[in-house]
Amino acid sequence: WQETLHPQTIDLGLERVRVVLRRLQLEPPAYTVITVGGTNGKGSCVAFLDAMLRAAGYRVGAYTSPHLLRYNERIRINNVEVDDAALCRTFARIDAARGDISLTYFEFGTLAALEQFQEAGVDIAILEVGLGGRLDAVNIVDAAAALVVSIALDHTDWLGADRDSIGYEKAGIYRAGQPGV
């Protein structure tokens, strides 16, 4: 269903998603955000941070992609996948809030994760970048800390033909005055 709502699979840019985020009243988030980008190793980094922060006593939300078996794997709270009913409620709320704004599959999922984290009252949300960083949907919220795991030639049609261009796109998740690794 979500795949039919947008004419393109990838549509880099943040304004459409920001409008829906505001309509959902999810800005600013009530939790700390850590954004993880890079070419390879993002999922492993998210899993490590998630485990470490939970061991320290934090309530943690983690958003990753793609999923392996079930969509619900993408959104976890304290390492438990959100259930179908919660996802359906959230998707319906996003669909109503978007009005005539088209959202990609990934943008829908990102908004669903942010909504679920808000609803669950997480302390920290770890968001994995889907593509690039600067114009990726997870970049609609300002991260308190951002990590770029690696930079290699990937998605050159979207991010640029060399490591410098790709690095620039991935570095777009950093915020002035906030820790970056």
Predicted features and spans:
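A conserved segment at the C-terminal end of the G1
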Residues: 36, 44-61
